[in-house]
Swiss-Prot record:
Belongs to the methyltransferase superfamily. Type-7 methyltransferase family. Mg(2+) binds at residues 179, 261, 263-264. Caffeine binds at residues 158, 161-162, 238, 369. Keywords: Magnesium, Metal-binding, Methyltransferase, Transferase. This is Probable caffeine synthase MTL3. GO terms for molecular function: metal ion binding; methyltransferase activity. The gene is MTL3. It comes from Coffea arabica (Arabian coffee). It is an enzyme of class 2 (transferase). It comes from the Eukaryota. May be involved in the biosynthesis of caffeine. The lineage of its organism: Eukaryota, Viridiplantae, Streptophyta, Embryophyta, Tracheophyta. Binds 1 Mg(2+) ion per subunit. Pathway: Alkaloid biosynthesis. Pfam families: Methyltransf_7 (PF03492).
């Protein structure tokens, strides 16, 4: 099965769907929003062609469910807020938003929400229906999506850490896994494996920057958020917890060792330095903002979080209940690719073990997702300076 066919979130509205298990991502969007507003402010002040009439925006790797439209809402609100603050003709330009993800993404779950979303925009923002136009643009964001110099603003949250393919060179000349017992580029991976993943990310991210710089107008903006490398003190990340669960199944004879050794996630968590270096070497963009932040696995659930997102369960919960929350979110993201390799039948047992590992991490006070935000401006052509 082709990677693009399984690299998507759980669709629909079941208990394990992304639509029902994405409050963590809502929290991340809350963290990103101040940077988004500043990015929009700089964009509108740049006075790009046709921006007074229609601002063209794309969300790359939009996923599905309510979070997709939360991103759209934040972008629209930022544009309207800045327009009001600037007191100029940009107060209510038409906004054309393209939602991009791979072909297997559940776009229908988003489209079903549009009528109520448009009504809410009209009620809360004073935007008449028709002043915000939302459509889908399916396809890989590692390829061309839009005409040259046609877009004002590109946004992507929690997508660019996904690679276009599993790196080559993960099998030795003897046909043995070079990353035996490990499912991604971790601290325990041999140096050649770490280099293979870094090389693939460098190739993919360079392609991403080059292609989308061609689609952006001169001085257009791009805002990216992705998972990044953490600190030694953070403990195991969720991929490590998954890896332990799979290894336990192998040890107990419930899963063939070959299945584990032949599985490598097409995912890479870069460091801030790596991202900065790639952007500078590719050369199309100026870095306006670059920072990292960390959030606990169970953020978005606990009533102790210092964020706007709050749990539906306003009671004290132990680590097992919180671990179940973490597991549902993780399963919504990773189940399609895991089930395609290991089989549907073993998924309940696998995620049960994952939940136990997550509970241990939370009990020890460990368990963080590390994220990176980078705001970019396309460098003007010499003739535009």
């Amino acid at each position: 099965m082709e990677l693009q066919e399984v690299l998507h979130m759980n669709g629909g509205e079941s208990d394990t769907s992304y639509a029902k298990n994405s409050s963590y991502n809502q929290l991340v969007l809350t963290k990103v929003k101040p940077v988004l507003e500043q990015c929009i402010r700089e964009l509108l002040r740049a006075n790009l062609p046709n921006i007074n009439k229609c601002i063209k925006v794309a969300d790359l790797g939009c996923a599905s469910g309510p979070n997709t439209l939360l991103t759209v809402r934040d972008i629209v609100q930022s544009i309207d807020k800045v327009g009001q603050e600037e007191k100029n003709e940009l107060e209510h330009p038409t906004i054309q938003i393209f939602l991009n993800d791979l072909f297997q993404n559940d776009f229908n779950s988003v489209f079903k929400l549009l009528p109520s979303f448009y009504r809410k925009l009209e009620k809360e923002n004073g935007r008449k229906i028709g002043s915000c136009l939302i459509s889908a643009m399916p396809g890989s964001f590692y390829g061309r999506l839009f005409p040259e110099e046609s877009m004002h603003f590109l946004h992507s949250c929690y997508s660019v850490h996904w690679l276009s393919q599993v790196p080559s060179g993960l099998v030795t000349e003897l046909g043995i896994s070079a990353n035996k017992g490990i499912i991604y580029s971790s601290k325990a991976s041999p140096p050649p494996v770490q280099k293979a993943y870094l090389d693939q990310f460098t190739k993919d991210f360079t392609t991403f920057l080059r292609i989308h710089s061609e689609e952006l107008l001169s001085r257009g903006r791009m805002l990216l958020t992705c998972i990044c490398k953490g600190d030694e003190s953070d403990g195991l990340n969720t991929i490590d917890l998954l890896e332990r669960a799979i290894n336990d199944l192998v040890v107990e004879g419930l899963l063939e060792e070959e299945k584990l050794d032949s599985f490598n996630l097409p995912l890479y968590t870069p460091s801030l330095e790596v991202v900065k270096c790639i952007v500078e070497e590719e050369g199309s963009f100026e870095i306006l903002y670059l920072e990292t932040f960390k959030v606990r696995y169970d953020a978005g659930f606990s009533i102790d979080d210092d964020y706007q997102v709050r749990s539906l369960f306003q009671v004290y919960c132990d680590e097992h209940v919180k671990a179940a929350y973490v597991t549902f979110f993780f399963r919504a993201v990773f189940e399609p690719i895991l089930a395609s390799h290991f089989g549907e039948a073993i998924m309940p047992d696998l995620f049960h073990r994952f939940a136990k590992n997550a509970a241990k991490a939370l009990r020890l006070g460990n368990g963080f997702y590390n994220s990176l935000i980078i705001s970019l401006a396309k460098k003007p052509e010499k003739s535009d300076v």
